Amino acid sequence: MTNPYSNYFFKKFFICLNSNDRIYLLKKIENSIIKLSLDEIGTYPIQTIIEYLNNKIEKMIVISAIKDHIPELIYNQYGSYVVEKLISCVDEKDIPFLYSFIANNFIQLAFNNNAICVIKKLLALNLNKYMHDIIKNIVIKHAKEFILHPCGNFVIQAIVEFWVDYLDIIFLYKNNFFNLSLEKYASNVIERFIEKDERILMEYIDEIIASGKIYEIMKSKFGNYVIQKAIKLSKNAYKNKLVFNAAIMINNLKDNKLIIKWKSILMPHINELPEDSIAKLNFRNFFNI
């Protein structure tokens, strides 16, 4: 099961076995399930086994072997994928110990390079209200830490993608869209916000314009992607308003490369503005066009 080639055979072999033979085989490898789960190759057949468990006895053997080793698995590069498969393929009622561990250690897991894949998978599920509320309350309490963290920001992105009440989380960051757009990891989350909901896109545009420093986002290593996305997604009056304000700020960029870059970005949209628009006149005068 740890051979790069024979592990493929084992996966196919297990799928083809009848239930009695599966149970016999699982009992034979029961004491090696954890070791295999932590192995670069062995993790794959264990994931296949979990995916194709089809009766109570099979589940009981595997769950019994794994139950006391969740921390060891979930923080491991390979074991975390076994836990992810458990969450995807086994009913919550059969693995309450796993959900309890996640609830009690959510922040540590969300901020871990390996465990975050498990958390993302969990957030995509239709969680019961108890688990949903536990996670939601943790995120509300530590909202800033999550959005700025290299792993934790994926929690916010997953909530926005999969949860019905995603706006409750987005509104935690309202009035901070400008500053968050300048941050390496948070800027990705802000992009997700404005992609998800047109109301948030409009809030974002209003906020960055009100700041009077839209040029800071335009020249930001991270923020420039957010405002480009906003220009692409916005419509009608909001697009015109955003393009107008970006155009009149272009001379604040100073750097010639940035100015040329933003000229090419804004040009197609500038042409859509009214002929007597101050932004259009400023833009044309600045570039002598």
Segments the model singles out, each with a brief description of its role:
Residues 1-289:
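Eukaryotic gene-expression regulator signature that favors modular helical reader/repeat domains
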